[in-house]
Amino acid sequence: MVRIALPNKGRVYEPIMSLFEGAGLHVIEHSQRSLFAKTVDENITMLFARSRDIPGYVENGAADLGITGEDFIQEAGADVEVLLDLGMGKAELVLAVPEASAIERPEQLAGKKVATEFPEITKKYFATRGISVHVVEVCGATEITPHIGVADAIVDLTSTGTSLSMNRLKIIGRVLRTSQRLIASKASLAQDGRKISEITLALQSVIEARGKRYLMMNVPEGALEAVKKKLPGLAGPTVLKVEADSPMCAVHAVVPENEIYRVINDLKEVGARDILIVPIERIVR
């Protein structure tokens, strides 16, 4: 039995559940208030917890796999194996001070107070730079602390910078880039490595297919080389012979979604026709 720990709430909850659905690991009999859930695979169950707690659960074997942010993994100092970057929940841990502050560089914070929800990461950031600061641990509303005299600076997460700007803060240092990671217990890898590899491959195949489309078209043999030059495929297009009155080929290729509009026009210009664009659910490399 493989137990997977997932975030029980937050902006990544729905994308993560959709990822598992796309991978064929459908969750059954679950609501957001449930702590556990079964899946269509009787050998896989899910448990739901705070993202911050998941690295510890995986490290101590309460869960075999988990999904959580790189920031929480680093903060916990968890001895786990990172298997996959899911590419979702992207954010950055930054060092910021009030816009009116004369401080422009991290070195100018020597001897001052820095508020954060990530004290271990913050201590390491300053220690590696030889800067002595007093770290003040808080549990939310970090942005307010410089304005009420609790701290001179903050280390906080931002994805767009909007919240920092609204709270009249400016970035003077970048601490850590984070996104959601699939992590594994080292003991579980040794014991259930095959099953864990199956789960990892299933999730990775969905991630690989994101932002890609499958193109199929008919191409006169005389236009084949020109068409091939226009296709930014994964490893070159697949070319198949077509039974037709005139020499014809079927060309298949995987193309980035954001290039479709340009590629179709280019293909038509050099002779491609009967072009089909098909969504891709999974790509297994």
Swiss-Prot record:
The enzyme's E.C. designation: 2.4.2.17
Listed cofactors: Mg(2+)
SUPFAM superfamilies from the UniProt entry: GlnB-like, Periplasmic binding protein-like II
Regulation acting on activity, per entry: Feedback inhibited by histidine.
One Pfam family this sequence matches: HisG_C
CDD domains in the record: PBP2_HisGL4
Keywords: Amino-acid biosynthesis, ATP-binding, Cytoplasm, Glycosyltransferase, Histidine biosynthesis, Magnesium, Metal-binding, Nucleotide-binding, Transferase
Pathway(s) this gene product operates in, as recorded in its UniProt entry: Amino-acid biosynthesis; L-histidine biosynthesis; L-histidine from 5-phospho-alpha-D-ribose 1-diphosphate: step 1/9
Record InterPro entries: ATP-PRT_HisG_long (IPR020621), ATP_PRibTrfase_cat (IPR013820), ATP_PRibTrfase_HisG (IPR001348), HisG_C (IPR013115), N-reg_PII-like_a/b (IPR011322), N-reg_PII/ATP_PRibTrfase_C (IPR015867)
Example GO BP: L-histidine biosynthetic process
Record field: catalytic activity: 1-(5-phospho-beta-D-ribosyl)-ATP + diphosphate = 5-phospho-alpha-D-ribose 1-diphosphate + ATP
Localization (cell): Cytoplasm
GO CC terms: cytoplasm
GO molecular function terms listed in the Swiss-Prot or TrEMBL record: ATP binding; ATP phosphoribosyltransferase activity; magnesium ion binding
Biological function: Catalyzes the condensation of ATP and 5-phosphoribose 1-diphosphate to form N'-(5'-phosphoribosyl)-ATP (PR-ATP). Has a crucial role in the pathway because the rate of histidine biosynthesis seems to be controlled primarily by regulation of HisG enzymatic activity.
NCBIfam families for this protein: hisG (TIGR00070), HisG_C-term (TIGR03455)
Family label: Belongs to the ATP phosphoribosyltransferase family. Long subfamily.
Protein name as catalogued: ATP phosphoribosyltransferase
Species of origin: Methanocella arvoryzae (strain DSM 22066 / NBRC 105507 / MRE50)
Gene giving rise to this polypeptide: hisG
